[in-house]
Amino acid sequence: MVKLRLGHEAKPEGEVQRVRAVQEAVGPQVQIMVDATESWNEGQAVAFGRALQEAGIVWLEDSMSHQNLSGLAHLSDVLDVPIAAGEHLFGLDPFQKTFDAGAVDIAIMDLARVGGITPWMKIAALAEARGIPVAGHVIPEAHVHLLAAVPNGHLVEYMPRSVPIFDSALTLEDGHLLAPQAPGLGVELNEAACEKYRVQQP
């Protein structure tokens, strides 16, 4: 799977062209996910979502404001493609309300935003009780462990780090990210590499 950021075209046809161009570049064996970064209103999300669904996407993320729970629920009802959201939610209560509203088909959780490992696991359990898969938002070094630890873990968002701050890199094998077996998160911080990015207050 690869994820494509959308949300800047005035008409659905423009976004569809982007998706088809990427699909042609990566080949038919690679599934396309899209992230609209909350760029659309509810009406646009339905129109763009239908067009993108026809283009073969397998994931529609952040189509509209995460606060528009009724709009997200409506979108989930009218589209077959899974509606993913949640990276902008902080803590357990907003996820509870989102789940109760039927606003997501896939819950995206950010370990740093929800409050750490324990709240993350509690939210994953809430999602599991409703049959909702969960995904991690960035921080793959931690999320690979969390998603392996819950029965409804769906996928890890992974991109190679442009800044090498760890002594060892995560292993990607046949499209799967392998959880390190060393203690803790299984990665060691490279103190010398981090020193280049240290910021000191005057």
Feature map (PLM): residue ranges:
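Catalytic core of soluble alpha/beta enzymes
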Residues: 4-137, 145
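Flexible C-terminal active-site loop/helix
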Residues: 137-202
